[in-house]
């Protein structure tokens, strides 16, 4: 399934050295849940190499649509399932690798009390008790949004939740909706909630209904600066980069050397 990016520390050093003499502008396509990890790692990468990075952020479905419409990208950070579909269409240049796992969490406005969600039943009751909630848009193939709607259906609360659910294009906007009082509770990937200082994020989520999602990183088949793109993808998989993930809400998934 995976075509491995295999880069030794020495080889990565050579890539960085080469990059300094021909800095490139790289376009990174990233899902919302991976945008903060990508930006955090990207800052260090730019400092080391002189490359400039810009980001296109969206749901897996939205990114797929833009890529299929012919938009240029150099590196893609997307769900494994989404990557599989893109790979079948030849949209990777033969290299993609497990990068991180993202998990679901809830958030309330900073200063408010988090509801009890210690069990599946407690989570269900918290959702029913909430005056309003926000999720990312299932219609845009948001992985968390699709999952949460299916979970409400499974719990038998789809109808009451429909009337008080505020849908946002991406999870980062879910956090904003909670912070500014549009919604009482936000439910999306933890990595999309944590960057917003206006919310308090749950440390846990009921294991019985948790749904970790694997994300991968790879070089786009439309990459204009292929060497620089490979260097960034490889850098994202290093132990140094993977160590940055937990503090910003995601679990490392790369096989670091």
Regions found by a protein language model. Name each.
Residues 4, 22-71, 78-90, 94-102, ...:
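Exported/periplasmic ABC-transporter solute-binding proteins
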Residues 6-17:
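Bacterial N-terminal signal peptides
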């Amino acid at each position: 399934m995976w075509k491995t990016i295999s880069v030794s520390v020495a080889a990565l050093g050579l890539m960085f050295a080469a990059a300094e003499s021909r800095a490139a502008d790289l376009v990174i396509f990233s899902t919302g849940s991976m945008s903060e990890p990508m930006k955090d790692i990207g800052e260090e990468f730019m400092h080391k190499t002189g490359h400039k990075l810009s980001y296109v952020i969206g749901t897996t479905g939205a990114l797929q649509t833009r890529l299929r419409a012919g938009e240029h990208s150099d590196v893609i950070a997307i769900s494994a399932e989404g990557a599989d579909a893109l790979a079948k269409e030849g949209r990777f240049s033969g290299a993609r690798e497990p990068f991180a796992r993202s998990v679901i969490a809830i958030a309330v406005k900073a200063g408010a009390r988090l509801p009890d969600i210690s069990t599946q039943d407690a989570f269900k009751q918290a959702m029913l008790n909430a005056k309003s909630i926000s999720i990312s848009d299932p219609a845009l193939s948001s992985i968390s949004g699709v999952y949460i709607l299916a979970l409400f259906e499974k719990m038998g609360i789809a109808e009451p939740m429909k009337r008080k659910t505020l849908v946002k294009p991406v999870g980062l906007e879910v956090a904003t909706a909670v912070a500014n009082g549009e919604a009482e509770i936000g439910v999306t990937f933890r990595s999309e909630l944590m960057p917003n200082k206006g919310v308090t994020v749950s440390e846990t989520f009921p294991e019985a209904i948790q749904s970790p999602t694997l994300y991968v990183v790879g070089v786009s088949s439309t990459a204009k600066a292929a060497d620089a793109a490979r260097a960034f993808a490889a850098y994202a998989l290093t132990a140094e980069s993977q160590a940055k993930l937990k503090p910003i809400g995601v679990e490392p998934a790369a096989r670091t050397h």
